[in-house]
A protein has these predicted regions:
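Aromatic- and carboxylate-enriched substrate-binding clefts and catalytic-loop regions
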Residues: 1, 155-433, 469
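Catalytic and substrate-binding clefts that recognize carbohydrates or anionic sugar/phosphate headgroups
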Residues: 1-124, 133-135, 139, 146-148, ...
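Short, hydrophobic/amphipathic alpha-helical packing segments
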Residues: 33-35, 51-54, 143, 252, ...
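Extracellular structured ligand-interaction cores
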Residues: 52-56, 65-67, 75, 85, ...
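A residue-level signal for conserved active-site and pocket-lining positions in enzyme catalytic cores
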Residues: 57, 108, 112, 149, ...
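Short acidic-glycine loop/turn motifs at beta-strand connectors
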Residues: 59-64, 225-228, 506-507
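Catalytic core of carbohydrate-active enzymes
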Residues: 321-335, 339-351, 364-368, 372-382, ...
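Extracellular glycoprotein-like low-complexity segments
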Residues: 633-650
Length: 650
């Protein structure tokens, strides 16, 4: 009727529904109702209808393992009702509904990537571990945290600066007492092998004499009230604020330009928060829907906030990303955003927002990450340890035990809470965290290869366990475990004081998934830690791994360690992607893609590099091989990259 519309898609019996973006609750979405309306949802629970990002998208997997996806191409408020089939109910003028059919859920994910775009390769440091809190303050406290990681030999790559570094919460400023020299702080962090990320919000303090407010006012960049002439004012952290109208290209260009001086302080990455946009002391937690945006014709021309609310955050991070790239054109940008819209993964990673330190959020972090990945956002993860509240050591250990293996791994907590660094809960929990993070860093070669795959075809990095066999109905509701790429299964230990029994993928041609562990820093094996997630390797896989490092580019990948688990034919295959870790050389062919195979031949396993692509020089590095055996033992060998390596099998 011009004001609202409905679209329905019938589904066959036995069809499982997923996606719908950032949603709390189980992985399988059948019977659920959610609403796409970006919301500041602090401490959200299972029945919270709207969170921080909007993805009007449903992935449907039929009983036979074939799949289709449905995208309601609307930016307006939209209800997704999955109680009886797939129903979209949206306000605003009728918009297209796009259906993607595929032979498998993987096929549909790739086609969604073709439609909405894929991530750009992030800087390699962004795939390391991130440490954050609201807030590390003053600057010397930041230095203490960084030094503590190094003194305790716990791997980490990034320290984050929350809002308290600013002068009175004024964006693009620094507190002259607590952060007198951000350039020196960032240089000190760099000396310890750390990168840094600093927060920027959209709410700009209404204050004459504040340069950002003055320059924005001179250019008339602010969102207007319904009368289309008066600037909208709303309260956020600095007090009364005005808000840039990112729907306008000129405003985005102005915003991007603000990053030039900001990034010149040696800033590595940017965190855009509160960009739903959040507004305090209002029942809706945001600005009025009749506020007016002066959007470009490319976005359909001017319109009300009801139309642009769900893309406000995405357009902000698009502008932020452009500013970061202009300031550091030789580096890959890293931007994290709380609010986003489907397709916004091209501009920013995301996290699952202001979760809580309780066992519900330990459980729900896995399906939330997976459904975001199934909705086109692969670079995501939760606040490990929980943002709101404190929790206890066992909770933190079990959260880190699997959270360290999610695509985005960041510990974070709120102001006033107890400390939640890996060492904050005592020696036993610290040991679990160190094992978990050492495991992540051993797997960086494999993870980086998965990020490259995602950048090429849109596949999620963390994938639901049913991707191992979409025809296995027993896996359709399994959300205590997840796949990293196609070849590693992560089984989390979630419930307090006991092991969780998860549904495992069926053997492949009679060969079961094989448990994998690594040496622990204390001389044992990491799998003996009851809080550690369990790892399993798909039959027929070669997993590239590396040595433990304090940060991802501390040393060259030498030796490369290949972990082999043969299939029923005695064969295995795997890939490794490498590049410079930053910059754009890989787009000009400066990378190395290697394909490794293993094959049992009488009493030996032959390991070869059978393909090599790219201009990156061969290093002639050492290659260590671990062949996993059915009886729980291993056979090992060593050689040089590019040479055949023979491993005798006992």
């Amino acid at each position: 009727d011009g004001e609202r519309w409905t679209a329905s898609v019938a589904i066959e019996e036995g069809t499982s529904l997923y996606g719908t973006g950032e949603v709390a609750g189980p992985l399988k979405r059948n019977g659920r109702v959610v609403e796409t309306w970006n919301t500041d949802a602090y401490g959200y629970q299972d029945d919270t209808a709207s969170l921080y990002t909007s993805h009007p998208w449903v992935l449907a997997v039929r009983h036979d393992g074939t799949a289709f996806g449905v995208l309601a191409d609307t930016t307006y408020r939209c209800e997704i009702d999955l109680r009886d089939g797939i129903v979209f109910r949206a306000v605003g003028p009728e918009q297209p509904v796009i259906v993607i059919d595929g032979d498998s859920p993987q096929d549909v994910c790739r086609k969604l990537g073709e439609l909405t775009g894929t991530i750009t390769m992030p800087p390699k440091w962004a795939i390391g571990y991130h440490q954050c809190r609201y807030s590390y303050d003053p600057a010397d406290r930041v230095r203490e945290i960084a030094q503590e990681f190094r003194d305790r030999d716990i791997p980490a790559d990034v320290i984050w600066m929350d809002i308290d570094y600013m002068d009175g919460y004024r964006c693009f400023t620094f507190d002259s007492e607590d952060f007198p020299s951000p350039s020196q702080l960032n240089a000190d962090l760099k000396d310890l092998g750390f990168h840094n990320v600093w927060m920027i919000d959209p709410g700009i303090k209404l204050e004459k004499g504040y340069s950002v407010f003055d320059s924005g006012t001179a250019r008339d960049v602010w969102v207007k009230k319904a009368n289309r002439t008066t600037t909208f004012e709303g309260e956020v952290w600095p007090g009364v604020c005005v808000f840039p109208d990112y729907t306008n290209a000129g405003v985005r260009e102005w915003w991007a330009g603000l990053y030039a001086d900001f990034m010149a302080h040696g800033i590595s990455g940017v965190w855009n928060d509160m960009n739903e946009p959040a507004v305090f002391n209002t029942p809706t937690k945001t600005m009025p829907e009749d506020n007016w945006h002066r959007a470009d014709e490319a976005l359909g021309g001017p319109g009300d906030h009801a139309r642009f609310h769900n893309v406000y955050g995405m357009l902000m991070v698009k502008a932020s990303r452009e500013g970061v790239m202009a300031a550091n054109p030789e580096k890959r940008p890293f931007v994290l955003s709380r609010a986003n819209y489907i397709g916004g993964h091209r501009y920013a990673a995301t996290w699952t927002g202001d979760n809580s330190s309780n066992w519900y959020h330990v459980d729900v972090s896995i399906p939330m990450t997976l459904n975001l990945g199934l909705s086109g956002q692969p670079f995501t993860g939760p606040d490990i340890g929980g943002f709101a509240g404190n929790g206890d050591g066992e909770m933190f250990a079990r959260w880190m035990g699997y959270g360290a293996l999610l695509p985005f791994a960041r510990g974070h907590t709120a102001k006033g809470n107890i400390d939640k660094e890996p060492w904050a809960f005592g020696e036993e929990v610290e040991a679990t965290c160190r094992r978990a993070l050492e495991r992540r860093y051993r797997l960086i070669p494999y993870l980086y290869t998965l990020f490259r795959e995602s950048s090429l075809n849109g596949m999620p990095i963390a994938r639901p366990t049913f991707f191992a066999d979409p025809t296995d109905m027993a896996l359709r509701s399994e959300d205590d475990s997840f796949l990293l790429g196609p070849n590693l299964l992560v089984v989390a230990q979630l419930q307090p004081a006991r092991d969780r029994v998860s549904v495992m993928p069926r053997p492949v041609e009679g060969v079961a998934w094989r448990e994998l562990d690594f040496p622990s820093f204390d001389g044992g094996r990491d799998s003996k830690d009851p809080d550690q997630a369990r790892l399993y390797v798909r039959p027929g896989s070669v997993i590239p791994t590396g040595p433990v490092m304090e940060y991802v580019d501390e040393d060259p990948l030498d030796p490369l360690t290949l972990i082999v688990w043969l299939d029923h034919e005695g064969k295995a295959r795997g890939e490794l992607y490498e590049d410079e870790g930053d910059g754009w050389g890989y787009r000009e062919g400066v990378f190395r893609r290697s394909v490794y195979t293993a094959e049992r031949d009488a009493g030996v396993v032959r390991v070869r590099r059978v393909a090599r692509e790219g201009k990156m020089d061969d290093e002639g590095r050492g290659v260590s091989v671990r062949v996993l055996l059915p009886d729980g033992r291993e056979a090992t060998g060593f050689g040089r990259d590019g040479e055949e390596i023979l491993i005798p099998i006992p």
